[in-house]
Amino acid sequence: MRVLGIETSCDETGIAIYDDQQGLLANQLYSQVKLHADYGGVVPELASRDHVRKTVPLIQAALKEAGLTAKDIDAVAYTAGPGLVGALLVGATVGRALAFAWNVPAIPVHHMEGHLLAPMLEDNPPAFPFVALLVSGGHTQLISVTGIGQYELLGESIDDAAGEAFDKTAKLLGLDYPGGPMLSKMASQGTEGRFVFPRPMTDRPGLDFSFSGLKTFAANTIRSNGDDEQTRADIARAFEDAVVDTLMIKCRRALEQTGFKRLVMAGGVSANRTLRAKLAEMMQKRGGEVFYARPEFCTDNGAMIAYAGMVRLQTGAKAELGVTVRPRWPLAELPAA
């Protein structure tokens, strides 16, 4: 079975083809970072228009990369939510139209389920059950995963997502959009312990997160200590350490609560090297395992959508006749396979 995956939920146009026997056959990705850089963030209207321009040419490029034609595709999977409504509609409309023209099923995919399953694209995929840390610009969630569609929300951010906090703090430090990866690079030059940021909501029971206060703490620290290059690097280090420690503490609690031995980390922030190292160290001490996708599959991409669509189709998902997207879509509402 060969599935064409279409991802257009935000500011990346991702197209991929996944074969259940041969694995990933093609992976095309276009990022709109330069388009939105002058605005300091994603402009929804510009994102939608750029998806319109790029989606079909990238599909053609993916077919060429895989050495396939339209008649070789058995299904089309597209991101149906959550995300920006206009951007989602571009991918959903193209996906549904192609499926109709090619007479194959059109499978709507939950964007965060795509991220959650992305580590299964690797050679050593995780087995169920596991705790999943979904950490990105729009989401920070801990999920108990016992099977496809068997997702229980354990905790989530009550305000900013971790990735959003990274980007906002990076802006305070004078870094360009998207600031998260640049902040991490700056943090690597920082002095450990010069500044100490709080670890929000770790002094009380529960698995929820709160990251908005760290941005305020960073702003106050910058005002009080100047903005020379080393000071900014030290502040970046303190901020990153606080976020990573908070995520690690909550992951440990989730593992203790569920009794699971496997931790899956997914979403854009899961590419963070410090976070990967800290969680790997923690799981080694616990006698467990941590799983994550390669960096290019941590951020938005078509490969995870093609794979998730294939999994859903193989477990009995029905093709959608209409074009429906859901900008807000709780993961727990997905049906169990």
From Swiss-Prot:
Instruction: Using the UniProt record, give the first listed, main subcellular location.
Output: cytoplasm
Can you cite an annotated GO cellular component? cytoplasm
**What residues bind Fe cation, as annotated?**
H111, H115, D300
* InterPro entries the record matches: ATPase_NBD, Gcp-like_dom, KAE1/TsaD, Peptidase_M22_CS, TsaD
Quote the record's binding site residues for substrate. Answer: L134, V135, S136, G137, G138, D167, G180, N272
**Which NCBIfam families does the UniProt record give?**
gcp_kae1 (TIGR00329), T6A_TsaD_YgjD (TIGR03723)
The name this protein goes by in its record = tRNA N6-adenosine threonylcarbamoyltransferase
